[in-house]
C-alpha cells in the first residue's frame, strides 16, 4: 500500500518538491530499484491482444520479458540499475498481509462470478487482483539479472527501506518505486514510473522533499505518514490527508494529536502501535550502505539465450539482438555526468533536520 495519499499531500502542499523528467536525464546515475514492485507491474501487464506471456508449460513469463527489456532500456540511456529484493516482511506488516490475503479471496470469488457471466472486463479486473509475486518469480528474475550482468541485493526486510539506505549512504542517486513510503524511510530522491513501458507515455516523477516543501522534521513527517495510513498499523478513521497534515503542523507528533482529538468524533484503533511504526521507519532493519558492494559485469549472451529461449520460449533472434545491445550499451556508458565534476556548496546552517529544508549532513546531492 505504501503511504495513502502522500503524493497528493506533496503535490498540494509542496509542489516544488515534484518535477517531471525523462529517462535520458538520468544518464550515468546509479538507481536502486524496488524489484518486487517492478516484477508485480510486469506480471499484471496484459498484451494488446489480451493474453499473458507464457512458456510451453503455461507458466507466466511476462515478468522476465518486462525485466529484460526495461532494464536494457535503462542501460541504453546510461543508467546503472541496482535491483533490491524484499527479504522477510517485518512482524508489524502481518496485519496488512492478512488483509491482502482476504482481498485476494474476495477477488477469486468475484472472478468466478464474472467468468460465469462472461463479463470479460470484470474478469480482467479481478484477475489482476489475484496476481502476487512468488518466490519462484524472484528466483527467476535474479537468475536473469545475473546473466545480464546487473547487480542485485536482497534486503533484510523491506526493499524500499534498503533502497533509502543506499541513497542516504551515497551508493546510489535515487530510489525507483511506486511506493511512497520510500520517502518515509528517508530516501532523498524518489523516482516513480521508472520501469513503466514507453507505450504508457507516463513521464518519470522525481520527488525531492529537501528541495522545497513541507517544512517538517523527519519525525513529524513520519507521524503524518502514519496518520495518512501505512502498512504497519491502522489509521484513524475520518482523518484524511488535509486533516493529517493540519494536525501534525499544529501539534508536531501523534502523542499530542491524541490529546486534542475529540473522542466522540474520532475512534482511536484498539492497541494502536503507532510508536512502533514510527520506530520502524526511523530505524528499519537494513544492511548498512557501507557494507553493500555491487558491480556491473559483462552480460552472458549464450547464457541469456539458453535461459530466455530454450527454457522460457522467447524468440532467439530478438533475445540475442537485445543482449548484444546491452553489451554495447555497457561498453559505451563510460562518459560521466557533467555535474559529477562539481561539488555542491551547502548554504547556511540548519537548526534541525527538516523535510523541505536541509537533510542531515552526508554526501553531496550530486554524486554520479
Curated annotation (Swiss-Prot):
Region listing for Interaction with PCNA, in residue ranges: 334-342
Protein residues bound to Mg(2+) 1: 34, 86, 158, 160
Lineage: superkingdom: Eukaryota
Region of interest (Disordered), residue spans: 103-123
Matches recorded under Pfam families: XPG_I (PF00867), XPG_N (PF00752)
Cofactors demanded by this protein: Mg(2+)
Gene Ontology cellular component terms for the protein in this record: mitochondrion; nucleolus; nucleoplasm; nucleus
Binding residues for Mg(2+) 2: 179, 181, 231
Keyword vocabulary terms for this entry: DNA damage, DNA repair, DNA replication, Endonuclease, Exonuclease, Hydrolase, Magnesium, Metal-binding, Mitochondrion, Nuclease, Nucleus, Phosphoprotein
Gene Ontology terms for molecular function: 5'-3' exonuclease activity; 5'-flap endonuclease activity; DNA binding; magnesium ion binding; manganese ion binding; RNA-DNA hybrid ribonuclease activity
Chain positions covered by the region annotation I-domain: 122-251
Cysteine-cysteine disulfides: none
UniProt modification remark: Phosphorylated. Phosphorylation upon DNA damage induces relocalization to the nuclear plasma.
Binding-site list for DNA: 47, 70, 158, 229, 231
Quaternary structure and partners: Interacts with PCNA. Three molecules of FEN1 bind to one PCNA trimer with each molecule binding to one PCNA monomer. PCNA stimulates the nuclease activity without altering cleavage specificity.
HAMAP family given in the database record: Fen
PANTHER family tied to this protein: FLAP ENDONUCLEASE 1 (PTHR11081:SF9), FLAP ENDONUCLEASE FAMILY MEMBER (PTHR11081)
Family from the record: Belongs to the XPG/RAD2 endonuclease family. FEN1 subfamily.
Biological function: Structure-specific nuclease with 5'-flap endonuclease and 5'-3' exonuclease activities involved in DNA replication and repair. During DNA replication, cleaves the 5'-overhanging flap structure that is generated by displacement synthesis when DNA polymerase encounters the 5'-end of a downstream Okazaki fragment. It enters the flap from the 5'-end and then tracks to cleave the flap base, leaving a nick for ligation. Also involved in the long patch base excision repair (LP-BER) pathway, by cleaving within the apurinic/apyrimidinic (AP) site-terminated flap.
Protein name stated in the entry: Flap endonuclease 1
Source species of the chain: Monosiga brevicollis (Choanoflagellate)
Phylogenetic lineage: Eukaryota, Choanoflagellata, Craspedida, Salpingoecidae, Monosiga
